[in-house]
Every structure is written in structure tokens, then in C-alpha cells.
A protein has these predicted regions:
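N-terminal hydrophobic/helix-forming segments and targeting peptides
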Residues: 1-453
Length: 453
């Protein structure tokens, strides 16, 4: 009997049928990525998807009965998908899956448009933790909405179609970079310089800000908006690139937004496709990258409101419901990268191709800001995954004292709900173009399916 713990390579153990299933699953995921590059787009895409599966809109206060398939759309930026089961929720609670649909990006400022040296720019304010230099000299698209004073929304999506223009942030040529290259990365790329180049043709017979006015005219002709309308807009600059297979063997997928859509997609497929008597609540949350704040983040009381509605409809004390519920915070982790091996402690790192990764805790340094899941809950999940023959691994987010990160797990756990982080290891996390293994997202689907059973 082998008493040691060893990671298993998913590809090495997969037969031909399993390899085909992994590849086919990734094809659907890549379409999901390309269609949804912002939190609003992911929610809209998901609503369209689940409505085809028979899910209906839910209004707070409505009764919920076993067999119902419902969703609650939170301001177009968050989504709660509910499968009301027949199991006794006073004993079993609710199976909760939570992923987030916001990703690091560049938001346009409220007064963004200016002209300098006959070039028109849009000023940005970065969202989430980025390395600013990675956003220079790459093609960028603009996605989002402009909310007009009459209450209507104008949808903007420029840079994705073959004939669309893209947008661009310049960098300094190496020949004149002697001063720039001596600075630290933090100081060498000021955030106020992350300005999108958006135009260069002046309107005729106008001397002042002629290029800026030309851009405004285009925006007015296409969208019916004026400069003032930027004040009530949510416009995001995101990479204008498609999800692509990586490697001669196509083992990987590179894309913008793997964090955290690589967990969003399998939590939805697990919710829709798994036969179960349990009541399942699948949550797509916003604002995780900036601390889960606001009324679309997981610090909002809305999750408690929905759990209370479930409890009321089933005639169960809400406190009892929460006590017996279980949650997976479906969020990515750092994949071990041999190019940067010193950032990791190899024995306790998540490896790509070795399955979905369970993080008992996250946080930073001395586990600060972490949800530290109990040994008993980890043991329970080990049994669940073993029963369904799911390949998975354990991991930490980098070596101790180097840094760290947080997830939504602690906010769910604060409600007296057993919660643990489980997600796909990512290489180049928070870069404009991240990398994941097709095998790992497939095992995430299998793990989440086992959990909701």
C-alpha cells in the first residue's frame, strides 16, 4: 500500500474518451469567454443560456417550491441561479457555488476625452490588481453601457469584430528609455499615462480641439451620446483578443478573463447538468477584484435575503438553513510557474494539468484576511470527490511572506456556512492574456458536479 500523497496528471490518466470530453468542454468555454468580456456581458450571456434551460426570473418575496428553476439578476452585473430541490434543507441546507465575473481592466474616467498634440485620448482608471506595463502596446476594445438621462441604456462594444478599430496605449521607444528603464516597475508606468489613443482626424474649419470634436461627432452619430454622457457611463477597456488554444498538443487555453470565468463556466454547467435532489444556489458575483464591495459584491446582504426567501418558502428557520449549508468559493489560484519558481513553495503549490485546486486558506503572510476552512469540511469534500473519482490537488497562493490574495470565501463563511476555495490554477494571473489547462477546467466541472450531488 502506498501511503504517500502524489499529484496526478489529468492528461496522463485520461483515456481517449476522456481526452475528447476535455477538448469538447474547452470549446464551449472558449465561446463563453469571447462572448463575455465584462461582468455585464457574462451575466447577459448566462441569462440567455439558462433561460433556454427553463429558468425563470425571480422576484424577492415570491414563493419558491421544489422543482423551481429560477434566477435573480442583480442590476445586470451579478446573477443568482437557483435550483429548488426536494431534499430536506433543514438537514442538508443549500449547496452554494460562488464565482466572480469581474476581471482586472481599465475603466474610462467620467470625464475622459482630451486632445494633445493633435491626438485624441480617453483617460482610464485601472480596476483591480494589474501590472500597468502589460497594458501598453496591445490592442484594446471598449465594452460597456452609457446610461442616458431619459433612462435608456446605450450598449457599446467596439474592437471585437474583424472590421472594428481597436484602441492603443503607447510606450516609449528603447532608444529614448534610458531614464525609464532605471525606474522600478511601480514608478516607471504612471497610472495617469494609461490613456487610450482613440482618434487623429480633425474636423474641418475648427482650430481648437478639432480631433476631440471629430471623435465626439463619431460617438454622437453612432450612439447618440455627448461628452456629458460619459458621466453616467460604465465603459471598460479590455484586450481585443480571442481565446486561443496554446501548444502543439492544444493542452491549454490563453484568454483574457480566466480569473474568474474559468470557474464561472463550470459552476454553471454543474448546476444545469447535474442530477440532484439538493437545492443548489449558483452565484455569479461582481466586484471581487476590489474587495467585493457595493450592492453587486458578495459583501452585500442580497445573498442573505435570497437564503431567507428559500428558508421561508420551505418553512425552515433561516439560521438552521445557513448552519447546514455548504459552499465552494470557486476562484482561481496561482499555478506553479517554473520560470518564477522562487515565488512558490513547490510542495504546496497548485500545478497546471493536475486538476482543480483546493485552497484551505488564502489571505497573506500569517493568513491575514483569510477564510481558513475546517479540517472536518476538507475531509467531507475529500470523500465527495473520491466517490466521483475526481482528480484534484491542494495548494497555496505562493510562498509564505511573499504576498497573497483574498476571495469571497470569508464573506460566505461569516454567515455560518462552511466554505472553502476551490478553483483552476492559472499562469500569468491578472495579465491581459492568461493561461489555463483544459484538463483543469474539466476537473473543476466534475468537482462542482460532485459537490452539488
Amino acid at each position: 500500500m502506498d501511503l504517500t500523497y502524489k499529484r496526478q496528471n489529468v492528461y496522463a490518466l485520461a483515456d481517449e474518451n476522456e481526452l475528447k470530453a476535455i477538448s469538447d468542454y474547452a470549446q464551449g468555454y472558449k465561446k463563453f469567454l469571447d462572448n463575455g468580456k465584462t461582468e455585464r456581458e457574462v451575466v447577459a450571456e448566462s441569462v440567455e443560456w439558462i433561460e433556454k434551460e427553463g429558468y425563470k426570473p425571480y422576484t424577492l418575496g415570491d414563493a419558491i417550491t421544489p422543482g423551481d428553476k429560477l434566477y435573480y439578476n442583480n442590476r445586470g452585473k451579478g446573477l443568482f441561479i437557483l435550483r429548488a430541490g426536494s431534499a430536506d434543507i433543514a438537514k442538508n441546507g443549500v449547496r452554494i457555488l460562488v464565482a466572480h465575473v469581474d476581471s482586472p481592466r481599465l475603466d474610462l474616467k467620467q470625464v475622459p476625452l482630451f486632445e494633445k498634440a493633435s491626438l485624441a485620448y480617453l483617460k482610464t482608471h485601472y480596476y483591480g490588481g494589474i501590472k500597468k506595463y502589460q497594458w501598453l502596446t496591445i490592442p484594446l476594445a471598449i465594452h460597456g453601457v452609457v446610461a442616458l438621462k431619459d433612462g435608456t441604456n446605450v450598449t457599446v462594444r467596439v474592437g471585437e469584430d474583424e472590421n472594428d478599430p481597436v484602441f492603443y496605449i503607447t510606450d516609449l521607444l528603447p532608444h529614448l528609455s534610458q531614464e525609464q528603464v532605471t525606474k522600478t516597475i511601480a514608478d516607471g508606468f504612471p497610472a495617469e499615462n494609461l490613456n487610450l489613443l482613440v482618434g487623429g482626424i480633425p474636423v474641418k474649419d475648427d482650430e481648437k480641439d478639432a480631433v476631440k470634436k471629430g471623435v465626439l461627432q463619431i460617438l454622437h452619430d453612432k450612439y447618440g451620446v455627448s461628452e456629458e454622457d460619459f458621466i453616467s457611463a460604465e465603459l471598460e477597456a479590455v484586450p481585443a483578443v480571442k481565446a486561443k488554444d496554446v501548444g502543439f498538443d492544444r493542452a491549454f487555453v490563453a484568454s483574457y478573463g480566466h480569473d474568474d470565468r474559468v470557474c464561472t463556466y463550470p459552476e454553471i454547467t454543474a448546476t444545469l447538468q447535474t442530477e440532484t435532489e439538493q437545492t443548489v444556489l449558483c452565484i455569479l458575483a461582481d466586484k471581487e477584484e476590489i474587495g467585493s464591495e457595493g450592492n453587486t459584491g458578495m459583501q452585500c446582504v442580497l445573498i442573505n435575503d435570497i437564503l431567507n426567501e428559500i428558508a421561508r418558502s420551505y418553512g425552515v428557520n433561516p439560521s438552521v438553513l445557513r448552519e447546514h449549508s455548504k459552499c465552494i468559493s470557486a476562484d482561481v489560484t496561482a499555478g506553479y510557474d517554473p520560470a518564477y519558481a522562487s515565488a512558490f513553495e513547490e510542495m504546496n503549490a497548485g500545478f497546471v494539468n493536475c486538476g482543480v485546486t483546493m485552497n484551505k486558506f488564502t489571505g497573506s503572510r500569517g493568513k491575514s484576511g483569510s477564510n481558513d476552512a475546517s479540517a472536518e469540511y476538507i475531509g467531507y469534500l475529500r470523500g465527495v470527490l473520491a466517490k466521483e473519482n475526481v482528480i484534484w490537488q491542494t495548494g497555496e497562493l505562493g510562498r509564505v511572506d511573499l504576498g497573497g490574495g483574498g476571495t469571497v470565501a470569508k464573506f460566505i463563511a461569516n454567515m455560518n456556512i462552511d466554505t472553502v476555495d476551490m478553483g483552476v490554477p492559472v499562469l500569468s494571473m491578472h495579465a491581459p492574456y492568461e493561461l489555463i489547462s483544459k484538463a483543469d477546467i474539466y476537473t473543476a466541472h466534475k468537482a462542482f458536479s460532485a459537490f452539488v450531488k
